[in-house]
UniProtKB/Swiss-Prot annotation:
It comes from Arabidopsis thaliana (Mouse-ear cress). Residues 7-199, 210-393 form the PfpI endopeptidase domain. PANTHER family: DJ-1 PROTEIN (PTHR42733), DJ-1 PROTEIN HOMOLOG E (PTHR42733:SF9). May be involved in oxidative stress response. InterPro entries: C56_PfpI-like, Class_I_gatase-like, DJ-1/PfpI. Expressed in roots and cauline leaves. This is DJ-1 protein homolog E. It holds the Pfam family DJ-1_PfpI. Keywords: Repeat, Stress response. Homotrimer. SUPFAM superfamilies: Class I glutamine amidotransferase-like (SSF52317). Induction: By ethylene, abscisic acid (ABA) and dark. Belongs to the peptidase C56 family. GO terms for cellular component: Golgi apparatus.
């Protein structure tokens, strides 16, 4: 996605930061040509921060699950607010530590003084309190346990009306140069608002709204579903996620794959839940321009389901756009979509692509061949989002 003006973002990180609230803005902004520096106090480029998934798993309060790590790409001590257009602070427990760090609090205050954008999520609004930014009635939202602290800090609490469940949480709020969200369920709208606030304009070659269907199941790759799903929402696309044996409002468990030190292959860890947004029987191929199959282990479930295989074949018969990430290529292989196509592939999918009649491209993280867009793994999502958006006729200009 071409950008006439280079934009830059600073991502303030720390151990146990919320994984979605870190990875989604990082990958989405990178795919749109925004430079993103990831920093953490007392750590340098090349060091890593632990990330966690936070979700409600049947208990009274959310559960925190350690999922993987993010490698920093810049040094905290080199940061100058004037070099950035926005600072993004994910949620997570790390903000409790950073709110007592004078250098971090001063950094946030300097962004505010410079009238730079500040984007907070879930619990990271504590950084605004520490910097004295909310005094004077700044409108703000957050995870509800933060409400009394926002009000005690002189802020004005805002909450999306009519919410009965997490499935219905979609909105966020902006007051001046301050953007706040209740957490990762609102990232579609939050990223849209962030792009607009950075001067981004979504341009489409098509007159009608692009529509995309994600095929998922239990143990779908966490970032492989959430990052493109939220990104396409931010671009104004109609986006649905379905699975054969669950109805709208039910959830699929996700998995994160973390390459731990000394291991030959990544370890699988439980990630967030992902809400199914439509019931299978309500899906009509004619309503969508593209079908996306994320990776993880869910493609093994889908390839054994006749309804899922038949649906993909119906997309093929109507010459739609196909996209797959990692193991998602398994379902495309079983339906003949990969025959004669060049496909981005890691080592684990090389044989599968070959027996399906495709050409495994090992040296590129993302490949587009005609109407088939493939990514080798979830780490290739920035390039994948660029290629998928291009295939849908969408660009973002700053």
């Amino acid at each position: 996605m071409a950008s006439a003006v280079q934009k830059s973002a600073l991502l303030l990180c720390g151990d146990y930061m919320e994984a979605y609230e870190t990875i989604v803005p990082l990958y989405v902004l990178q795919s749109f040509g925004v430079s993103v520096h990831c920093v953490s106090p007392n750590r340098n480029a090349g060091d890593r921060c632990v990330m966690s998934a936070h979700d409600f798993l049947g208990l009274e309060l959310y559960t925190e699950l350690v999922v993987d790590q993010l490698t920093l790409n810049a040094n905290f001590d080199d940061v100058t607010p004037e070099n950035y257009d926005v600072i993004i602070i994910p949620g997570g427990r790390f903000t409790e530590l950073l709110s007592a760090d004078e250098k971090c609090v001063d950094l946030v205050a300097r962004f505010a003084e410079s009238k730079k954008l500040i984007f907070t999520s879930c619990h990271s609004q504590v950084m605004l309190m520490a910097a004295g930014i909310l005094a004077g009635g700044v409108k703000c939202t957050a995870f509800e346990s933060i409400k009394p602290l926002i009000e005690l800090s002189g802020g004005e609490w805002w909450q999306q009306p009519g919410i009965q469940s997490m499935f219905e949480i979609t909105d966020c709020v902006k007051d001046g140069n301050f953007m706040s969200t209740v957490g990762w369920p609102t990232l579609g709208h939050g990223i849209k608002l962030l792009l607009e606030s950075l001067g981004g304009k979504v341009c489409s070659l098509e007159k009608k709204q692009a529509s995309v269907l994600f095929l998922i199941g239990d143990y779908v790759e966490d970032y492989g579903i959430n990052v493109p799903f939220r990104a396409l929402q931010a671009l104004g696309c109609k986006v649905d996620a379905v699975t054969p044996n669950k109805k709208k409002g039910e959830v699929c468990a996700t998995a994160v794959y973390d390459l731990e030190d000394g291991r030959q292959i990544p370890a699988e860890k439980r990630g967030h839940n992902f809400f199914v947004t439509a019931s299978w029987d309500d899906i009509c191929v004619d309503d969508y321009d593209c079908v996306v199959v994320p990776g993880g282990r869910s493609p093994e479930l889908l390839v054994m389901n006749e309804k899922a295989v038949a649906l993909v074949k119906s997309f093929a018969e109507k010459d739609k756009v196909f996209a797959a990430i990692g193991q998602g290529k398994l379902l495309l292989a079983a339906t003949g979509v990969l025959k004669g196509k060049r496909c981005a592939s890691g080592k684990g999918m090389k044989v599968m692509v070959k027996v399906a009649g495709g050409e495994a491209v090992m040296e590129k993280g993302c490949v587009t061949d005609g109407k088939v867009v493939t990514a080798a793994s979830a780490t290739d999502l920035p390039a994948f989002l660029f290629d998928l958006s291009t295939a849908l006729g969408l660009t973002v200009m700053f």
